[in-house]
């Protein structure tokens, strides 16, 4: 990952700053860059943090989204904008509604999910009111090497790698293992983002996912089977959420019919890559 980042740094102009919450600075940045495409992924994306500090999540995600749209209008060149929402927008989904289509009701059940619904709707409103060429996506759970251990697959892999290295006892601390999620590799999702912004229809929204659901317990078993040691699994109440959705699985027919995209990297490969990444980090 570090080698790839170094390669990219030689090909991009990197600006560091709190631009999203500073509209004048963001407008200056847009004027200097003159973008054709705007990929807006910056957000407070950790659901539990939205419960402990909901206002920070709402401000960063909603105000940041609005500023991106305002800066795009001010630019005058109408760049294509990708608004990245979340499958969490759908919230509590009834079994009869699975797999989840873009037309499903939105029932957000966390401050984070509410913020993503607001971003989604702002994107549509600025398309409808100002003719900004906005494409919206609702990605389902995506994973890969380098992801923060705040997220479940990276958390499990990091615990295994540290236990293998003798940094702590071989005990795996877990939350809810019954929840089922639609996991895709981030490399597939990023490919989908580019297809969405380049081939998606302005004003439309598209699901991105693997169209398969796996329980968190299945993910854990796959990672444990790749470990070089035996680990004991222990529940940890601190890892449980105030509300959790039992099953999430995407229907991506709309996006596939538009672009031909589908998730290609198997879950097993993604998990092995994540575990190998953390083994490398632990050795440093």
Q: Where in the sequence are the language-model features?
A:
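Amphipathic terminal alpha-helices
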Residues: 267-284
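Non-catalytic, hydrophobic alpha-helical segments
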Residues: 189, 193, 208, 219, ...
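Residue-level signal for the nucleotide or nucleotide-sugar donor/cofactor binding architecture
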Residues: 21, 52, 60-63, 103, ...
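NAD(P)-dependent short-chain dehydrogenase/reductase
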Residues: 93-99, 121-182, 186-197, 211-213, ...
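Generic structural signal for alpha-helix termini and adjacent loop/cap motifs
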Residues: 53, 71, 75, 159-166, ...
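Conserved beta-strand segments of alpha/beta enzyme cores
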Residues: 11-13, 133-135, 173, 204, ...
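N-terminal Rossmann-like NAD(P)+-binding domain of SDR-like oxidoreductases, especially those catalyzing
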Residues: 1-142, 216, 265
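Mid/C-terminal beta-alpha module of Rossmann-like enzyme folds, strongest
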Residues: 156, 199-240, 252
């Amino acid at each position: 990952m570090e080698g790839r980042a170094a390669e990219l740094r030689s090909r991009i102009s990197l600006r560091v700053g709190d631009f999203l919450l500073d509209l004048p600075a963001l407008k200056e940045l847009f004027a200097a860059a003159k973008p054709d495409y705007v990929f807006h992924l910056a957000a407070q994306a950790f659901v539990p943090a939205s419960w402990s500090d909901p206002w920070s999540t709402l401000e960063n995600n909603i105000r940041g989204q609005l500023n991106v749209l305002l800066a795009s209008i001010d630019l005058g060149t109408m760049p294509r904008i990708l608004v990245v929402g979340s499958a969490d927008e759908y919230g509590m989904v009834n079994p009869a509604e699975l797999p989840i289509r873009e037309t499903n009701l939105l029932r957000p059940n966390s401050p984070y999910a509410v913020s993503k619904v607001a971003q989604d709707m702002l994107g549509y409103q600025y398309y409808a009111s100002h003719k900004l060429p906005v494409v919206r996506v609702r990605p389902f759970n995506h994973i890969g090497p380098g992801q923060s251990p705040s997220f479940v697959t990276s958390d499990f892999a990091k615990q295994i790698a540290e236990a293998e290295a003798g940094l702590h006892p071989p005990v795996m601390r877990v939350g809810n293992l019954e929840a089922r999620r639609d996991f895709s590799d981030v490399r597939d999702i990023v490919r989908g983002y580019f297809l969405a912004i380049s081939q998606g229809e302005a004003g439309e929204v598209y699901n991105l996912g693997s169209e398969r659901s796996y329980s968190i317990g299945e993910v854990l078993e796959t990672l444990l089977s790749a470990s070089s040691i035996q680990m004991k699994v222990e529940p940890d109440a601190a890892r449980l959420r105030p509300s959790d959705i039992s099953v999430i699985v995407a229907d991506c027919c709309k996006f596939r019919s538009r672009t031909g995209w589908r998730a290609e990297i198997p879950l097993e490969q993604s998990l092995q890559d994540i575990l190998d990444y953390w083994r490398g980090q632990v050795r440093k």
